[in-house]
């Protein structure tokens, strides 16, 4: 309901939470579609757009696309230092992915 009626920053936030809950339900493809909508149409609300990239990284990992997952998260860390909380969240996700992958792949360094 909120997502349908909201505009501006509230719409961006509503889309973020829609993507978040779809990710939590392991509906990674649908979650990425919501993230893409947010980025395409509400990128002026940078906080929510950047925060949604972390969800996208988690979605890619859920879809077993480690390369895309790490690429997205590394770019958040590298390019959006003005959002400390989001960078911290992206770093936590990236570290978790690298740790999991290091257990099954010797070419991946956990740090």
Features from the language model and the residues they span:
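Acidic, polar-rich low-complexity tracts and alpha-helical solenoid repeat scaffolds
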Residues: 1-111
């Amino acid at each position: 309901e909120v997502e349908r009626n909201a505009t501006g920053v509230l719409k961006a936030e509503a889309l973020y939470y829609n993507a978040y809950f779809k990710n939590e339900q392991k509906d990674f493809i649908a979650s990425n579609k919501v993230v893409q909508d947010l980025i395409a149409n509400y990128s002026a609300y940078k906080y929510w757009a950047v925060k949604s990239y972390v969800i996208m990284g988690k979605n890619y990992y859920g879809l077993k696309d480690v390369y895309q997952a790490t690429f997205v998260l590394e770019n958040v860390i590298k390019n959006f230092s003005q959002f400390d909380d989001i960078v911290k969240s992206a770093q936590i996700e990236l570290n978790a992915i690298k740790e999991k992958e290091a257990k099954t792949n010797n070419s991946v360094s956990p740090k």
